[in-house]
Amino acid sequence: MSSPRERNAHSKGPRKSGQRAFNRKPDNGSDEWLWGWHAVAAALSNRKRSAPQRLLATPDRAKELESRFGRPKALEVVESAAMGQILPQGAVHQGIALRIPPLESVALEDFEAGRGAVLLMLDQVTDPQNVGAILRSAAAFGAAGVILQDRHAPKLTGALAKAAVGAVDKIPTAHVVNLSRALETLADLGWRAVGLDGHTETYLDQALDGGPTVLVLGSEGEGLRRLVAEHCDELAKIPMPGGFESLNVSAAAAVALYEASRTRT
């Protein structure tokens, strides 16, 4: 039986190889803010990051920062209420926030297709909490990286970064325009793509062979888009003996990463 990628190949053409005055409104660069201790500490520890533009901390948090990092030049000691007026409404900042330029996207060629290597690719997964939780799981299970869309994907800041608990700065991320073309490029680099699809007959453990694998996950409700699914080498599902398919995409990613990690041993 031919794979989704093989079936798709017949229908397409050839491949193309100190302290400031505070505004009472949210900062204009609100999409570049990180908040929460773990997210901020991970960013400050990441040598690939640019210099902080602003670093806000309550007096107690400022002491923690100084004991770990010295006194950062951008540090501004403020009260919690003042910080809440600068950040987007509802930000659970835990007394610390950092405005810093975003991390640069890595190239697909930078991912090493070694034995047991695993990448995650997210197809229109737009909920920041879910993407943050997926990054956290990717870090926990030693994934090589996560591939996101330039569009239809949340920024790696704010609530997403807080949900990731520092994983934004631990897991390399690649942003691509077209997931189908990205899968073609990865195939040329030695990666095999396994898409998660609850309607197929193949179970995930049967689809994994221990080689360099891209686990492709779609959005909740919609699942994988047709062209993305067609560019996968195989489609597989997570067995659910309870008969109640209730896993959200972040839980499914964690289960898939665990299953993939078993093939390394």
Segment roles from a protein language model:
Residues 1-113:
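N-terminal positively charged helical leader segments and presequences
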Residues 41, 139-140, 162-167, 226-265:
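Structured adenosyl-cofactor binding patch, chiefly the S-adenosyl-L-methionine
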Residues 59-60, 80-83, 151-153, 178, ...:
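Short, ordered loop/turn segments at secondary-structure junctions
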Residues 90-101, 164-168, 210-218:
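Short basic, glycine-rich beta-strand/loop surfaces that mediate nucleic-acid
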Residues 114-201:
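RNA substrate-binding interface of SAM-dependent RNA methyltransferases
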Residues 129-133, 224, 249:
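Short glycine/serine/threonine-rich phosphate/pyrophosphate-binding segments
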Residues 194-248:
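Active-site/ligand-binding-proximal alpha/beta "capping" segment
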